Amino acid sequence: MELGRATKSWSIHTRSEIIGKYKVMERIGSGAYADVYRGRRLSDDLTVALKEIHDYQSAFREIEALQMLQGSPNVVVLHEYFWRDDEDAVLVLEYLTTDLATVISNAAKEGIPIPVGELKRWMIQILCGLDACHRNMIVHRDLKPSNLLISDCGVLKLADFGQVNLIALIIFILFGFST
């Protein structure tokens, strides 16, 4: 199984539509359904995260949710995506340098508490991101510190929407109308 996964992960480096627009750099994360690479957009040198999703349902849910949440200041930005039926989806996402799990771990190791004002600001940003989700009838279902990314200027954003429930889609399928 690992051999197959390694082969799939390598496909991001060989797909012409991706390498024609992006330089794929080091892998920065890996999970059950996806691998994430740091990348650089060739047209303007923008650093991005390239998320290769190996599971069809996770890819569908994440793309749908991020498209619905475009413009929300506390949700990671989806720049574009590449997806064909016979290959893994690759999402081009906003690159954020750290996550809340890393910040908490570093603070604990260094014995330096995170300032209360910073914690309050992040809590408000988490709630704003969740509010955007809930207004769009999206339930995240995988909120944890490692899925809360933080920019260099301290803005916290919700990420990893592969396990979401799209309530509006469920209502449409069950009842044939939208809310």
Regions found by a protein language model. Give the residues of each.
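Activation segment signature within eukaryotic-like protein kinase domains
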Residues: 122-123
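Catalytic-loop of the protein kinase fold
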Residues: 134-150
